[in-house]
């Protein structure tokens, strides 16, 4: 799956950049018929029309490059308010935000953590948990890190 993701980034990033968008991230889910989710961002936000434009361009290139064997579903969307954080650079830009983290392996007895993204040090993200404790994770040991908007 890592090789497929690398190939997809290599194909999709220049397309989104040429169209004036930021490639926020790519997620591939499912087995058999895959769903390829491409998240784009723009300083002025992302509309449904933007997603349609990007989707059409990517589909045309995928038809030629054929990066995915078999059938797949292509979804293009904004990362949204509860955006997934795909890399350490994005994490640095989101310091101070409420986040939810899911680890690949249990830390103590838990894999899910919620708190404020306090800071980034090298490849480590440090969260200030709801109970006031700080915890550090190597970014590569996280299954998922996502912004968790506070609506209170």
From Swiss-Prot:
Q: Which GO terms describe its cellular component?
A: cytosol
Per UniProt, the keywords (alphabetical) are: Cytoplasm, Ribosome biogenesis
Spell out the subcellular localization from the entry.
Answer: Cytoplasm
| InterPro entries found in the cross-reference section | Ribosome_maturation_RimP, RimP_C, RimP_C_sf, RimP_N, RimP_N_sf
Where does this protein come from, organism-wise?
Francisella tularensis subsp. tularensis (strain SCHU S4 / Schu 4)
Q: Name one GO biological process term.
A: ribosomal small subunit assembly
Family, per the entry? Belongs to the RimP family.
Purpose of the protein: Required for maturation of 30S ribosomal subunits.
User: Taking the first listed entry, what is the main subcellular location of this protein, grouped into a coarse class?
Assistant: cytoplasm
Q: What is this protein called?
A: Ribosome maturation factor RimP
Tell me where on the tree of life, at the top rank, the source sits: Bacteria
């Amino acid at each position: 799956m890592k090789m497929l993701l690398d190939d997809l980034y290599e194909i999709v990033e220049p397309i989104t950049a040429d169209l004036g968008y930021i490639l926020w991230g790519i997620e591939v889910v499912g087995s058999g018929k895959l769903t390829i989710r491409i998240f784009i961002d723009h300083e002025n936000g992302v509309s449904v029309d933007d997603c349609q434009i990007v989707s059409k361009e990517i589909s045309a290139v995928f038809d030629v490059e054929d990066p995915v064997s078999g059938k797949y579903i292509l979804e293009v969307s904004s990362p949204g308010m509860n955006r997934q954080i795909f890399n350490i650079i994005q994490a640095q830009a989101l310091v101070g935000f409420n986040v939810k983290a899911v680890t690949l392996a249990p830390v103590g007895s838990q894999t899910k953590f919620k708190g404020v993204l306090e800071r980034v040090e090298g490849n480590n993200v440090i969260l200030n948990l709801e109970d006031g404790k700080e915890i550090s994770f190597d970014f590569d040991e996280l299954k998922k890190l996502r912004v968790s908007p506070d609506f209170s």
